[in-house]
Amino acid sequence: MRLGRCLAIGTFGELSGRKMLVKSETSAVDRLPGIDLYDLIGEMFPINRSLTGAGVRKTLGIVGRHIDLDIHEVATGTAVLDWHVPMEWNIRSATIKTLDGKCLVDFAENNLHVMGYSKPVNGVFGRAELARRVHTLPDQPDLIPYRTGYYADDWGFCLPHSLWQGMNDEHYRVDIDSDLSPGSMTYGEFLVPGETRREVLITCHVCHPSLANDNLSGVAIMTALAMRQSERRGRLGYRFLFLPATIGAITWLARNEAMLDRIEHGLVLTCLGDSGPFHYKQSRKGATIDRAAAHVLKHCGEPHEIMPFNPYGYDERQFCSPGFDLPVGCLMRGVHGTFPEYHTSADNMDFVKPEALVRSYSAIEALLDLLDGNCTYQRGDGRGEPQLGRRGLYRAIAGQREAGGATQMDLLWFLNLADGQHSLLDMAIRADVPFARLEAAARLALDAGLVRLVAAA
């Protein structure tokens, strides 16, 4: 059950709908995802994905078993802002063998072995020539790096440095059975309509191959969130985008400029399955989503860090570009490029932890409830404190919980700040208590006829 809901605000700001006075406290069970996140990641992990191609379609097909996903295909060459949709890439096999037929590197064993978007090749190459197309990690000699060449007419292999150091033959037979041809780029979209036209935009990238944290963790968590939101009617709509990184976000923005004024809040999800602390990267201009995320993380019981916006990272770069400047932040645990498993074969099913996935899901669920329930109230008569005792709202023992889940102090904070100027989030931040407790206090005061709803924040 949701934490609560304001009166709906119509398209032009008028109040509409009826009060929804629902239970304010949420049990631990309510914060559990409706699917096994770790198992879902495990199902998607073996699939080879890139900006385009069969792997993305297969992945979105798995997501589509859980939500009614709209699949969009955008043709190769389509102009999108300053870019064009690239050629479609598909790969069937790739190997490096000795001349006597011994297979040393096989794409079938790990899809990180081939540089993404490698063009087809078949021939015998000298070691020196092959060295220019081999990517390794000398500081992590047993790991396979993840590399791409999306917009380069090139090919390459990625392998453990220890393996490469032992490859001392003069020549090797190389085969990459791939094709780059006109086709399309695929992305998925799922909209849960709200009572108003205003929306929360939630996105993740779906273009990485067998990397569990970056970003199958985001794909799985976003799928579970979409399932959860589809089962409830909120004040806000929720638009979930499963996109190839960069070009996918740019394409969606180019095709949807006319509706961007609906986006009230936005969140990019990535790297949410490791055991590290939460990191929230703020939007470019500062927005309610930034304050809301900081508040939820402060009260979630886990270490966290708030990071200022910078123009490098994930698709928040596109949503926050100056021509759009949407209120979109990014939530992650491990920050790109800062943990040793990043973009290596160590980002595997052992690296992501089921408990971290569930805690990430729970924090985001609380954030969505906050955004949907963030309203502004005003006292009917703000002169002095109202008499709580005759309304059954007074407790002589300091700190004792009222029936609706708020303490007496929560109720006093709410009644003092219910001046038509402070939203529930403003109140929760100032009182330094979880949002749900101020929302519970609002429900009690509204039930008692002490306040009226002024606006939904």
Residue ranges and their predicted role:
Residues 6, 12-457:
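N-terminal hydrophobic/helix-forming segments and targeting peptides
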